Amino acid sequence: STSNRYDDTAMWKLPTTASYQPMNAVLALEAMKRLVKEPTASWRKILETTSWKGRMEEALPGIVLDGAHNMPAVRALAKSIRMQEKFRSPDGKLIVLFSAVKEKDYHEMIRFVCREIPADLIVVTKIPDERGVNPGELQKDFAQWTDSRVVVKDTVKEACSYVTACKREQDQVYCFGSLYLVGEMETLLREAARC
């Protein structure tokens, strides 16, 4: 969670590790102050219990879903991951699960990810939509920019099964690149948690 001082009144807590959410919360509070004309302190409890689906959302312990699907969002995600790195176990691995749609600049996203996110393992897959990039193409792009192992899984379900099977307690998985991927993963992980 993130703590920050706001409005010279108190410490505000957000239940997120996303580096970009404190600014989003401040913007929301300022809007509410002007639109609703209520003191910001009344919103404190609400913020402390707010969750943002698909935004640095820990869907299961050590498995984070983030809707980063363009360069600004991937940059913000990378910043959040780097901030969390100091808390990861020394023998823990960082696993990336990635997919993208054809009309996004996924080549640039992949170059950036390889340069800025210290992944030990990268799993690529295809979203269940004709706009999804072939995972073999994603693998080739990643292979140009990293020495980390890149594993191809043909479906999101196979990718989900793979990362949950190989993830150890001390490992951290970040799933991003497509909102479709995050939505599919959320459904699959919710079903897995019920079993």
Where are these regions (language model features)?
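Short amphipathic alpha-helical segments
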Residues: 76-78, 90, 109-111, 135-137, ...
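C-terminal helical cap/extension that packs against the catalytic core
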Residues: 1-3, 22, 64, 110-172
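Glycine/aspartate-rich loop-and-adjacent alpha/beta segment that forms the canonical ThDP
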Residues: 178-195
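Nucleotide phosphate-binding/pyrophosphate-handling subdomain across enzymes
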Residues: 8-121
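C-terminal alpha-helix
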Residues: 34-35, 162, 166, 188-192
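Alpha-helix capping/helix-boundary segments
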Residues: 27, 158, 180-181
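Short helix-terminating capping/connector loops at secondary-structure junctions
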Residues: 88-92, 168-170, 174
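Glycine-rich beta-strand-to-loop/alpha-helix junction loops that act as flexible
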Residues: 98-101, 126-127, 176-179
